[in-house]
Amino acid sequence: EIPLRLVGSEMCIRDSYSEMKEFFPNNHVEYFVSYYDYYQPEAYVPKTDTYIEKDSALNEQIDRMRNAATRNILENNDVIIVASVSCIYGLGDVESYAAMTLPLAVGDNVEPRDVYKRLTELQYERNQTNFVRSTFRVQGDTLDIFPAHYEDRAWRISFFGDEIDDIYEFDSLTGKKTASLQKVTVYPANHYVTPRPAISQAITGIRKELAETVENFKNNNKLLEAQRIEQRTRFDLEMLETTGHCKGIENYSRYLTGRKPGEPPPTLFEYLPPNALIFIDESHISVPQIGGMFRGDYNRKKTLSEYGFRLPSCVCLLYT
């Protein structure tokens, strides 16, 4: 069983995390909260005709901890998750996330270029000069990978032709070897990573809804809204086709995860096993808070769809 402790207050969650680490020193105690230092959601105010573009500042440390949390849920049984109410927001599909992993083992026969390509598909960036989290670099027959869940450690993969000859862990700052490894598994750098076939299928569904939405706006003499939704969605589709990602990709979650209209999006709860235990701290505060988050998100997205900033399917992206 994997326990999840849901804490309503962002201030109290740090204390809860420290307590769990102290009570269970031999367990994988993980921290899962919103990874934004600053977050301004996309919104539209009809009264003043004001469109507010999504703006945010990502906290790298918390993003690393979120990646460590989902990875350990899938790999270990001794995991305890301390989470804030933000865990009810949509997260990438767990099946796609797990399917996109890249296992590497000593003795594997694999073309190095194929490994580089797969890392790019996992949203890892090739960077020869600035070796940081979620990047990789190549030096001759050596590949260095800085996993998304690590803070100061990385992996070195040595090739001999098309065979993996050696794998070891090293300190990312000093380069000192810290452990010899027989195998590693690289998890996606982003929870919204989606396999290419799923992206192609999603694009087909998005185009169909776009055509229906444009026609509906035109039939109701809402020409500005029709032009707006067509222009914005087509740009997103181009980005999805070329890079597999786009700004505001969470608004297309229904298609990327293959859900039906009205079905809730995957969240952290989908990553947990069926026998997981969930504890809600101060439920008299946390539960109403969740309800308020639901209503606020619903109204915001409904307005965006009514005025042609987003497709109607974005309103389905509500948490359970």
Task: Label every model-predicted segment.
Residues 9-20, 36:
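Conserved Walker A/P-loop ATP-binding site and its immediately adjacent core
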Residues 1-8, 13, 319:
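Single conserved hydrophobic/aromatic residue that forms the stacking wall/gate
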Residues 35, 39-81, 85-318:
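N-terminal cationic and glycine-rich segments that engage phosphates or anionic surfaces
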Residues 26-34:
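Conserved RecA-like helicase motor-core motifs
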Residues 5, 20, 82:
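Hydrophobic/aromatic pocket-lining and membrane-interface residues
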